[in-house]
């Protein structure tokens, strides 16, 4: 039985779990290492020392010189051995060049991925322009209804009185008059209306601001109109005479 990483019996330290980015980088590094080893093993010892023509062209495309030496660095911060063969130098330069060209995968950078998707999904808004007054509309139906105000076209006719309308919903509201139906009721006074827009106009009458009540002063006390009715109904009693 094997214990998880960095865990012991009775220990409360959570196990060390590598992140998704670390796993991806390890997989990519392993694949690159296998590819480079296969490439170098296919060459003979003489070709490794002098590098073949195909390998030299490929290294030139990566801006790597097979005979160059690594850049010196401090011994305290460097993880490169002091004595390195030409093959190790070549390995290091190829891996550093390949890793420098690697970008962050799309699943590790969701913000950039969302920006790309939003740019693709965003479509230009359609505009419908009236040929009479150049007014813009976002829907073709609204443009068609608007153009009837210029042409005075009324395709919807009432079978009872013969009156014509530009819109079908206007004809529907008009038919309530002949049927003596008033489906739209006022919630405040209960009055009925045939058309909803007429009910909306009626509702505004209930919200009219009431006039300010009259006030008057009696001595140093301020009274309103309702208080004056009480004063008239019940005369004041002089307590000094009791």
Curated annotation (Swiss-Prot):
One Gene Ontology CC term in the entry: nucleus
Q: What InterPro entries does UniProt report for this protein, alphabetically?
A: C2H2-ZF_Transcription_Reg, Znf_C2H2_sf, Znf_C2H2_type
Its annotated function is as follows: May function as transcription regulator. Essential for larval development. Required for morphogenesis and function of the digestive tract.
Any matching Pfam family: zf-C2H2
For this entry, list what GO says about its biological process: negative regulation of transcription by RNA polymerase II; pattern specification process
**Which lineage ranks, top first, belong to the organism behind this chain?**
Eukaryota, Metazoa, Ecdysozoa, Nematoda, Chromadorea
Per the UniProt entry, what species is this protein from, by scientific name? Answer: Caenorhabditis elegans
List UniProt keywords, sorted A-Z: Developmental protein, DNA-binding, Metal-binding, Nucleus, Repeat, Transcription, Transcription regulation, Zinc, Zinc-finger
Give the UniProt subcellular location, in the record's own words. Nucleus
Does the record carry Cytoplasm as a key word? Answer: no
What protein name applies here?
Protein odd-skipped-related 1
* UniProt similarity note: Belongs to the Odd C2H2-type zinc-finger protein family.
What does a knockout show?
Answer: RNAi-mediated knockdown results in defects in feeding, and failed growth and development eventually leading to lethality at the larval stage of development. Morphological and functional defects around the pharyngeal intestinal valve and intestine boundary with multiple cavities surrounding the isthmus of the pharynx in 1 to 2 day old larvae, and accumulation of ingested bacteria in the anterior intestine.
**What Gene3D superfamilies does UniProt report for this protein, alphabetically?**
Classic Zinc Finger
Q: Name one GO molecular function term.
A: zinc ion binding
Which sequence ranges does the entry mark as zinc finger (C2H2-type)? 128-150, 156-178, 184-207
This protein's encoding gene: odd-1
């Amino acid at each position: 039985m094997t214990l998880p990483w960095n865990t012991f019996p009775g220990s409360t330290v959570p196990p060390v779990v590598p992140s998704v980015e670390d796993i991806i980088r390890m997989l990519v590094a392993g694949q690159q290492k296998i590819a480079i080893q296969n490439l170098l093993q296919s060459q003979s010892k003489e070709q490794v020392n002098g590098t073949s023509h195909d390998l030299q062209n490929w290294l030139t495309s990566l801006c790597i010189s097979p005979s160059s030496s690594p850049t010196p660095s401090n011994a305290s911060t460097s993880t490169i051995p002091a004595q390195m063969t030409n093959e190790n130098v070549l390995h290091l330069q190829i891996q550093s060049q390949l890793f420098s060209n690697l970008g962050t995968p799309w699943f590790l950078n969701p913000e950039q991925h969302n920006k790309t998707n939003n740019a693709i999904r965003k479509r230009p808004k359609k505009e419908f322009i009236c040929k009479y007054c150049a007014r813009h509309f976002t829907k073709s139906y609204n443009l068609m209804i608007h153009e009837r105000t210029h042409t005075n076209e009324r395709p919807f006719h009432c079978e009872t009185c013969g009156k014509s309308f530009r819109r079908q919903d206007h004809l529907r509201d008009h038919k309530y008059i002949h049927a003596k139906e008033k489906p739209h009721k006022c919630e405040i006074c209960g009055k009925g209306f045939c058309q909803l827009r007429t009910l909306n106009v009626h509702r505004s009458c209930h919200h009219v601001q009431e006039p300010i009540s009259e006030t008057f002063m009696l001595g140093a006390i301020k009274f309103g109109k309702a208080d004056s009715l009480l004063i008239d109904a019940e005369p004041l009693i002089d307590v000094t005479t009791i």
